Curated annotation (Swiss-Prot):
Source organism of the structure: Helicobacter pylori (strain Shi470)
One annotated Gene Ontology cellular component of this protein: cytoplasm
PANTHER family: S-ADENOSYLMETHIONINE:TRNA RIBOSYLTRANSFERASE-ISOMERASE
InterPro entries on file: QueA, QueA_dom1, QueA_dom2, QueA_sf
Name by which UniProt lists this protein: S-adenosylmethionine:tRNA ribosyltransferase-isomerase
Pfam families assigned to the protein according to its UniProt record, in alphabetical order: Queuosine_synth (PF02547)
Gene3D superfamilies assigned to the protein according to its UniProt record, in alphabetical order: QueA-like
Length: 345
């Protein structure tokens, strides 16, 4: 069936529609509103986004905070040049972390970040990840100090389709105004559309709940299996506070800000008796595993053959999704992380 064929999720996007910078002010970004019942499409801007939110809906937001996850070092202690790039993915345990390292590397290699801080390669994993340990003055660093090291020397992990180096504006624009808990290596991009003013209006006028899904590097990996149902999606760390769990359990109508919030809600609502706050979320939503508990979604325009495009298709239908994306291309909407948005009602 074509809805499970990977090639069905391909489309051509003119390169000039890939957004390399955000629209400022945020309210000026374009918004495509699609009402499924009437099939009506409205073209507007984020200045009016809250006007379209159903009044009784619970709005769910992901308050993860992006780490400056790209850090450069040298394989030599005297630091002639920092040309070795380490991309931090997530903590493993204690002072160790799963990373990607560009270039040739072997177990035992050291990467020096300055005269005091370095990392040592412990293991080369089959999936391309490298397990490394962080040290300060030859003493194992705790996780809080590793985050401080990344904050001091790291760079914002812009997605690979943004073809430029990170700049000072990315430190705040590639971060939502409600980002709180450090741990993501990619931004939950629908959240980037909210200015402080729009957020305050949302919190005042709508029921809302926060959760934390630390977006992983796997979010940029395309689906590679010909039959999308065979794809194994990445696992991400999810935390839902008890207060938010209680609100979610009571709510009949849910609007998610972004696919990360939607995946989190769907994962949580399918658990029989959740009795903890921390989870490992690995839910892959598509037409054979449809959305059951979320009614509305605010999202960006996603990459061809991506699991996120399949999620949107699970909500809208494959043919309608392709039709809407074609309209967005014709109307010169900007795509991907710094691009425009789509509200599905």
């Amino acid at each position: 069936m074509k809805e499970f064929d990977l090639e069905s999720y391909d489309y051509d996007l003119p390169k000039e529609l890939i957004a390399n910078y955000p629209i400022l002010p945020k309210e000026k970004a374009k918004l495509l509103v699609y009402e499924r019942r009437s099939q009506k499409i409205t073209h507007t801007t984020f200045e009016h986004v809250l006007d379209f939110f159903p009044k009784n809906a619970l709005v769910v937001l992901n308050d993860t905070k992006v780490i400056k996850a790209r850090i450069f070092g040298s394989k030599h202690a005297f630091l002639p040049s920092k040309t070795t790039e380490v991309f931090f993915h997530r903590f493993f345990k204690d002072n160790t972390a799963l990373t990607q390292i560009k270039g040739k590397i072997k177990v035992g290699d050291k990467i020096f970040f300055d005269a005091h801080y370095h990392a040592e390669v412990l293991e080369l994993l089959h999936n391309g990840q490298r397990l490394i340990a962080f040290y300060g003055n030859k003493t194992p660093l705790n996780q809080a100090n590793i985050l401080k090291l990344l904050e001091q020397y790291g760079h914002m992990p812009l997605p690979p389709y943004i073809k430029r180096a990170d700049e000072s504006l990315d430190a705040h624009e590639y971060q939502s105004v409600f980002a709180k808990h450090m741990g993501a290596v990619a931004a939950p991009t629908a959240s980037l559309h909210f200015s402080q003013n729009t957020l305050e209006k949302l919190l005042k006028d709508f029921k809302h709940a926060f959760l934390t899904l630390h977006v992983g590097a796997g979010t940029f990996l395309g689906v590679e299996t010909k039959d999308i149902r065979e794809h194994q999606i990445h696992t991400e760390v999810l935390r839902i506070p008890k207060k938010s769990q209680e609100i979610l359990q009571k709510s009949q109508e849910i609007l998610c800000i972004g696919t990360t919030a939607l995946r989190s809600v769907e994962y949580f609502k399918r658990l029989e008796n959740p009795n903890q706050e921390a989870f490992e979320c690995d839910i892959f939503l598509h037409l054979a595993n449809p959305i059951l508990h979320v009614n509305y979604l605010l999202t960006n325009f996603h990459l061809p053959k991506s699991s996120l495009l399949m999620l949107v298709s699970a909500m809208v239908g494959l043919e309608k999704t392709k039709e809407i994306y074609q309209i967005a291309i014709e109307k010169k909407y900007r795509f991907y992380s710094y691009g425009d948005g789509m509200l599905i009602l």
